[in-house]
């Protein structure tokens, strides 16, 4: 009985910690429970329709009128990685790529509790530890020690969860314009992205590196760059004629060397 109680108490914070969206590998048939989400964004994908004898009926939205099977209904592949969801229209070449906002799992109910009792959890962690040691030294009661040990583990896991959620809040979600404090990082790697440049009347000046000479607005500056900042990796996607993904380490951005090297070469010449 004591073992079952310990297991139950330990499982609660563990479940909270792992309450995240599952990954979804690239597939043409997403899970049925997710069809409503995908068919809201990609209502022209074939997995949203049941087509028989040239007549197609929507699988999710029954009030949708039947339509004739035609080029509107396309073959699609979908996948999900943490904070972003993507679907490809595979019947078009080159493939068209679309990004959508993944449905967010709500952590608000336990985040509010954790934030409210943050100091209490910290003090409680030390208090239970002290009582645990004192009780073991004085009475050496195994049952009491086990209960206190369970409480100590719960306080520890809750504190880790609190720290984890704080780090989650600092992540930069998918977007076309990264935070200003991160511009130096992104413009080191994706120096041709439009958010790195201030363009007026066909003349573009770099927002981050003031020593960079003005350049004329041209195809070098991609006007569609998307950035994703996960816990330990950063991605940016440049969309110009066809999508192109780049990955880098967030914690160790490459120093801005390309312009310095160029200026040194010019000085030598």
From Swiss-Prot:
Q: Does the keyword Transmembrane apply?
A: yes
Q: What induces it?
A: Expressed in the immediate early phase of the viral replicative cycle.
Disulfide-linked positions? none
Location(s) in or outside the cell: Host membrane
Identify its protein family.
Belongs to the asfivirus MGF 110 family.
Function of the protein: Plays a role in virus cell tropism, and may be required for efficient virus replication in macrophages.
According to UniProt, the name of this protein is Protein MGF 110-1L
Q: Which organism is it from?
A: African swine fever virus (isolate Warthog/Namibia/Wart80/1980)
Question: What lineage does UniProt assign to this protein's organism?
Answer: Viruses, Varidnaviria, Bamfordvirae, Nucleocytoviricota, Pokkesviricetes
């Amino acid at each position: 009985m004591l073992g079952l109680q310990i297991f139950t108490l330990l499982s609660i914070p563990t479940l909270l910690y792992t309450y995240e969206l599952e990954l979804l590998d690239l597939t043409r048939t997403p899970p049925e429970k997710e069809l409503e989400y995908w068919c809201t964004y990609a209502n022209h994908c074939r997995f949203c329709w049941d087509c028989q004898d040239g007549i197609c009926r929507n699988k999710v939205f029954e009030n949708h009128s039947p339509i004739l099977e035609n080029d509107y209904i396309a073959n699609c592949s979908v996948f999900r990685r943490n904070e972003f969801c993507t679907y490809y229209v595979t019947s078009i070449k080159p493939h068209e790529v679309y990004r959508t906002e993944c449905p967010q799992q709500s952590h608000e109910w336990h985040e509010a509790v954790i934030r409210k009792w943050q100091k209490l959890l910290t003090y409680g962690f030390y208090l239970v530890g002290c009582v645990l040691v004192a009780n073991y030294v004085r009475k050496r009661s195994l049952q009491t020690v086990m209960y206190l040990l369970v409480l100590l583990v719960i306080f520890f896991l809750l504190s880790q969860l609190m720290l984890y959620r704080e780090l989650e809040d600092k992540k930069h979600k998918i977007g076309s314009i990264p935070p200003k404090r991160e511009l130096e990082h992104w413009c080191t790697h994706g120096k041709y992205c439009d958010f790195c440049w201030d363009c007026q009347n066909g003349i573009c000046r770099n927002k981050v590196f003031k020593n960079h000479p003005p350049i004329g607005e041209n195809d070098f500056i991609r006007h569609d760059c998307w950035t994703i900042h996960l816990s330990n990796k950063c991605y940016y996607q440049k969309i110009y004629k066809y999508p192109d993904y780049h990955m880098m380490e967030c914690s160790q951005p490459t120093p801005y060397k390309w312009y310095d090297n160029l200026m040194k070469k010019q000085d030598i010449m």
